[in-house]
Amino acid sequence: MPHTLRVAVTQAEPEWLDLAGTVEKTCNLIGEAAENGARLIAFPECWVPGYPGWIWARPVDVELNTKYIYNSLSLGSPEFETIQAAAKRHSIAVVMGFSGRAPSDSLYIAQAIISPDGEVLMHRRKVKPTHAERTVFGDGSGADLSNVVDVDFGGEIGTVKVGALACWEHTQPLLKYHTLSLGAAVHVAMWPPLDPHGGVEHPGLWSMSAEGCQSLSQTYAIESGAYVLHCTAVCTEKGREAMRTHDGLLFHTPGGGHSCVLGPDGRRLTQALHGGDPAKEGVVYADLDLSKVVANRAFLDNVGHYSRPDLLWLGVDRREKGHVVDGERRL
């Protein structure tokens, strides 16, 4: 029987628009989680250098967009290697969301899974940015469907399949079904800071609220039969001032932190931090009994015994689509 896997789910505030500062905080949280016995730590969507909340306050902000590009994180950069080194030093897997900067200076909502040995096991981009996010971020491609990897924790735990999706990717049935087919036992659902819904007359969508997004994560836990690490960020007055979101649809009040761990049947396993104060930082810890994933899938396996592939099936194109094609070869 598999042993338990101790996980850490951050509920923290980034150093807004500060690449070096957020990388330093990332490494500190990695060390803290390892000291508390965690073997895997999860970070939210666009953790580095923070989610660009101003996109929900005004249609364009050239100054902040430019600063955001300069402070976004590139795969293979010294900053990324610093995070890899922290994972290796503390022997902990890191599942992290970040604003990924391409060599052309385009940005993508990116995710990475780093092994306890410091190896990048998975790097992907959000397949389709949501609404106003498209003013900052580009689309992913076929290779970004590969979002579940084997993470070797060694010892009694051994290898565990770990996966991730970003934010409203949890609304997309086809993308979710493909991810289900990859068989993760632990899934990280990455979200930005989330506000409670303002009521029936509020112009914002309930499906974008703290309640709505947790509902999406819980639904994914039920559908997949996996543990879901529902990871959100915090935005205090410091973030509001940095992004000037006081009058925005989102990020207009301090808060955003609603991190928790969900069981493979959808139940919430952890209590809210700090009595439910969403403006306070912390780390949620949980010990995952991986045998419960197997037990749950005996009842519900949507890509196995509880499916009808003779009637319904999913077509997938995992090829990376290059921007320049030289004959049959994409550059």
Swiss-Prot record:
Residues 5-290 form the CN hydrolase domain. This is Arylacetonitrilase. Nitrilase that hydrolyzes preferentially phenylacetonitrile and (R,S)-mandelonitrile. Also acts on dinitriles like phenylenediacetonitriles (PDAs) 1,2-PDA, 1,3-PDA, and 1,4-PDA, and cyanophenyl acetonitriles (CPAs) 2-CPA and 4-CPA. SUPFAM superfamilies: Carbon-nitrogen hydrolase. Its EC number is 3.5.5.1, 3.5.5.5. One of its GO terms (molecular function) is hydro-lyase activity. It comes from the Eukaryota. Belongs to the carbon-nitrogen hydrolase superfamily. Nitrilase family. The active site is at E45 (proton acceptor), K126, C167 (nucleophile). It is an enzyme of class 3 (hydrolase).
